[in-house]
């Protein structure tokens, strides 16, 4: 089916990813690789240069925490763990999805989404932003 599948996840809101895991596995069934992507907010150190060292330590802590949670998430899959890669990046979800997709030559994005609320309709969501700006097919799982 698909060889490179990007699955953006929020490791601090795992329930959004549970259904998406099964769909990603289905799409990867013929030796595909699932690339879990967690995106942390872009660096605030540019505006807080007096506190740059503290901000950097905090970012390193967040990255380490995200990497640990991604590793835990791998256990939710039934496919061989060697076919699941983990990526933690800083920036906006939509930009990092497109950048990783280009780097990998990815085939599809699988993203979990919740039912829209009034705030989502007004402000948008990561899933809708990815859909609007993606350069490849996106499967949204609710």
UniProtKB/Swiss-Prot annotation:
Taxonomic superkingdom: Bacteria
Pfam families linked: Usp
Stated family: Belongs to the universal stress protein A family.
This protein's name: Universal stress protein G
Species, as recorded: Shigella flexneri
């Amino acid at each position: 089916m698909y060889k490179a599948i990007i699955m953006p996840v929020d490791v601090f809101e795992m329930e959004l990813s549970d259904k998406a895991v099964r769909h990603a596995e289905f799409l990867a069934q013929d030796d595909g690789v699932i690339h879990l992507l967690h995106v942390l907010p872009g660096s605030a150190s540019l505006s807080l240069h007096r506190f740059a060292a503290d901000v950097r330590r905090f970012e390193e802590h967040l990255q380490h925490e995200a990497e640990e949670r991604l590793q835990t998430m791998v256990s939710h899959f039934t496919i061989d763990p060697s076919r699941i890669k983990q990526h933690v990046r800083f920036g906006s979800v939509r930009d990092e999805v497109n950048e990783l997709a280009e780097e990998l030559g990815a085939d599809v994005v699988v993203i979990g989404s919740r039912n829209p609320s009034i705030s989502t309709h007004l402000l948008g969501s990561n899933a809708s932003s990815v859909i609007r700006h993606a350069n490849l097919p996106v499967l949204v799982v609710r």
